[in-house]
Amino acid sequence: MSKNKTKLIITTPQGYFFNDDVEIVTLKTTEGYIGIQKDSQSLIASIKPSKLFINQINSKDLKICAISGGIAFIDKNEIKIITDAIEFKEDIDLERAKKGKEIIEQKLKKPNLSKSKIEEYNLKIEKANNRINVKNNSDTF
């Protein structure tokens, strides 16, 4: 068992998405990508819609996820992430993601949209693009 482990807990409105020991988690904050390991400094960070990388204990394989945003609470031995949506790369339905994006793009073309609706639709497009990019692109940032 690795001594360099930290607990990662990811929760969504549906419950626990991930709850296990990891060596490192890489996620994108408003300041850019950060890697979090055991003995990290305490931090609360806003997570941008992006790829999230999970390196489990004694594994060379990365788990890659599409996260729609959220908040990370980081301390010395634990990382807690709260998000409204996250899914593993292999679970992303690419056609559904593309169709969802097309629907939102059509809504965005309607005249007389309020500023808040435009912002809401743009965020939904950003999240859809993230899911599409995570599914299509290589396993890098």
Swiss-Prot record:
GO terms for molecular function: ATP binding; proton-transporting ATP synthase activity, rotational mechanism. InterPro entries: ATP_synth_F1_dsu/esu, ATP_synth_F1_dsu/esu_N, ATPsynth_dsu/esu_N. The keyword Signal does not apply. Its main location: membrane. CDD domains: F1-ATPase_delta. Produces ATP from ADP in the presence of a proton gradient across the membrane. Disulfide bonds: none annotated. It comes from Mycoplasma mobile (strain ATCC 43663 / 163K / NCTC 11711) (Mesomycoplasma mobile). Pfam families: ATP-synt_DE_N (PF02823). The gene is atpC. The lineage of its organism: Bacteria, Bacillati, Mycoplasmatota, Mycoplasmoidales, Metamycoplasmataceae. This is ATP synthase epsilon chain.
